Design a protein with these regions (language model features):
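Multi-pass alpha-helical transporter architecture, strongest
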Residues: 11-17, 215-254, 260-261
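Short amphipathic helix-loop junctions that connect adjacent transmembrane helices
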Residues: 69-86
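Loop-to-transmembrane helix entry/capping segments in MFS-fold secondary transporters
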Residues: 83-84, 166-180, 207-208
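Pair of pore-lining "gating" transmembrane helices in MFS-fold secondary transporters
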Residues: 46-70, 146
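Juxtamembrane intracellular "pre-TM" segments in multi-pass secondary transporters
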Residues: 19-56, 78, 242-261
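C-terminal transmembrane helical hairpin of 12-TM major facilitator-type secondary transporters
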Residues: 115-158
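Helix-to-loop junctions at the C-terminal end of transmembrane segments
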Residues: 100-114
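A membrane-interface helix-boundary motif in multi-pass transporters
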Residues: 1-4, 82, 195-221
Length: 261
């Protein structure tokens, strides 16, 4: 109920307070057929690269639920952590995430560029997950939070690349589609990760391995990196890549690819 209230307040604040970010010449008329998740995705199919890049981002968000959905269970099972230690650990993760996404990312991503930030970030993120999976001492979980949180540079960089693949008039449509897909991962991710934890800590499991969700998360992040690399490399080699009408909008060197009519 409280969450619903905050969501409503957020919507009202956005509607009445936040200014329109697009210039008048970049706006378009409201259409009901596009004002829904399915409609947004259908309209964006004219940009073929988006499917692979959105898939890459979806894998990142599913992988993130390895920590979000099972952190408490895993550390109680493995290290018998108390409520105090669990709360402290999550607080440390929160502070580190805030430092990376609220500060470091402003220096790291411009230096590396969006594309390289995606690869480096996902590699570090995957390494952090893998380390969590096989940690056998409590202190290791705190140390391995560093690469895990540093991997947070990948998500914004990937979203920046996605934004660079559509013109300014379709940015809202893109963000709506991304929000819908990310919301779906909040259903799929917890279900997959908690089920995996439950199975590998049950008496019927071939081996007791509470870190299985982190291992799966690490693999998903590697697949995400490979998928992003494949899509972005294809863009550079295919002839139907045209310069973006708004250079520097976030894509690779301002590239946008549209399907032939």
């Amino acid at each position: 109920l409280v969450s619903a209230g905050f969501t409503l307040l957020n919507a009202l604040y956005g509607f009445f307070v936040l200014p329109e970010s697009l210039k008048k010449e970049n706006r378009r008329n409201f259409e009901w057929k596009k004002a829904n998740p399915v409609g947004s995705l259908v309209q964006l199919k004219k940009y073929p690269s988006l499917a692979g890049l959105i898939g890459s981002l979806v894998l990142v968000y599913i992988a993130a639920h390895a920590l979000q959905s099972t952190w408490t269970f895993i550390n109680i099972d493995r290290f018998q952590w108390s409520k105090k230690t669990l709360g402290l650990s999550l607080g440390v993760v929160g502070v580190m995430t805030m430092i990376v996404q609220g500060g470091l990312i402003r220096f790291i991503n411009p230096k590396l560029g969006n594309e390289r930030s995606v690869y480096v970030g996902l590699a570090i993120y995957s390494a952090g997950m893998l380390a969590f999976a096989f940690a056998n001492q409590s202190w290791m979980m705190f140390v391995f939070m560093i690469p895990y949180c540093l991997g947070g540079i990948a998500g914004p960089a990937l979203q920046g690349i996605l934004s660079g693949h559509v013109p300014p008039t379709e940015q809202g449509e893109l963000q709506g589609a991304l929000t819908s897909m990310i919301s779906l991962t909040s259903i799929v991710g917890p279900l997959v990760m908690t089920s995996l934890f439950s199975y590998f800590t049950s008496p019927t499991a071939p081996v007791h391995f509470s870190g299985a969700p982190f291992l799966l998360g690490s693999v998903l992040l590697l697949i995400s990196a490979i998928l992003a690399y494949y899509v972005l490399r294809q863009e550079k080699t295919e002839p139907n890549v045209e310069p973006n009408i708004e250079p520097g909008f976030g894509g690779i060197k301002g590239f946008v690819r549209e399907a032939p009519e």
